[in-house]
Amino acid sequence: MRKTEKMKRPHNSSHVKQEERADDSHSNSPASSKSIKQENLLKCELCSTVCSSISQLQSHTLSEHVPEKKPSISTSNSAPSTKRVACQQCEDTFEDFAQFAIHMKSHLSSVTSQLFFCPICPVGTPFRDKKSQLEHLTTQHLQIQVTQHICSICDSAFPSPQAQSVHFAEAHKKYSCTNCDFETENEKTFKEHSKQHSRQLIMYGCALCATSYPSQLHLITHVQMSHDQETFYPPSLPIPTPPSPKSTPKQRVLQCSVCDESVLGEDGLDEHRLRKHCKVRFADKCADCQEPLLNETSFVEHCLRHSKDHAHHCPVCRQSLRSDSQIHAHCAYHMSHQDSTSSTSSSPITNGFSFVCPICGEKLDDGFALIEHTKIHL
């Protein structure tokens, strides 16, 4: 008779318990605790029990579904036992529980060995391969992104587009000619090039009538036809040199306290206050005594009459006057309306200048005086 096959329970139960404790201790390790958090719960296929780890499933299967059987004498009519232990992970079957336990350990080691955890994340983020772990570690924890703006000409790096623009404007400034396609970064070279697009024009002017001509021959013809009754050919004259201007002291730039406008010198500031901020334009009476102001003499007389501690002020607008030039300036400003009305009935102004020397700028009374004056430049 064939001997019936029986599932034998390991006789050394302490050995099995030691393996279970070893599995439990292995499951309590930091790596396994991380894997438990990430893996799904395991359900026993023999009952409705749900286990959180493979080792717990093994212990449950061992204690609940593998009963301890006593050896019995098999009869010749009994059929061989075909019940085998099945793995819930890969559906492999085994003849006894010892083989099943060894097989389950391989599943546990393979699961834990396939996961790679981030050493920086507090929750221990798992990854299936080393490449994913390194990519996460680099991009999330170790990467420092720095944006730089590179100059397209000299490859210099700058932290912002504004700094790059300032560098480009200062270091690579170009001077472009508007008449041609010439470009350069040197200012001196650009000025030399600009001379190619300019021409020199010499004009010859008449000192008597202030007319100008493009050539000396045209000027001679003009003098012959306009300023000489007889045939006259003036000799070639040297180019007159204007007299050197007298050196004047440098004036300070002052600021008006009313409108903050900048003017040159104290006289310029006084004139600015008079013409821009004086509220009384014309007046025919003194503001202090209400006597009429007939002319410049009476205006000056009232300035002296109403002065206090040698401090003069205008009898019309009461503005302080520092010098005689200011007194005459205020007189001309406030009494010009009277002068203009009286001048309509009187003779024309005798101190007007109609002739000006084109060489030195001196003003002369008539044309004959201008002719005599031009002789000093010959």
UniProtKB/Swiss-Prot annotation:
Bias (Basic residues) ranges: 1-14
The segment annotated Disordered runs over: 1-36, 61-80, 231-250
The record's annotation in InterPro entries points to: Znf_C2H2_type
GO MF, any single term: chromatin insulator sequence binding
In this chain, composition skew of type Basic and acidic residues spans 16-26, 62-71
Q: Which GO terms describe its biological process?
A: regulation of transcription by RNA polymerase II
Question: Which ranges are annotated Pro residues under compositional bias?
Answer: 235-246
Disulfide links within the chain: none
Chain ranges of zinc fingers (C2H2-type): 42-65, 85-107, 204-226, 254-277, 284-306, 312-334, 355-377
Task: Name one cellular component (GO) term.
Answer: nucleus
Q: Which UniProt keywords are listed?
A: DNA-binding, Metal-binding, Nucleus, Repeat, Zinc, Zinc-finger
Provide the protein's localization: Nucleus
Name it.
Putative zinc finger protein C09F5.3
Organism lineage string: Eukaryota, Metazoa, Ecdysozoa, Nematoda, Chromadorea
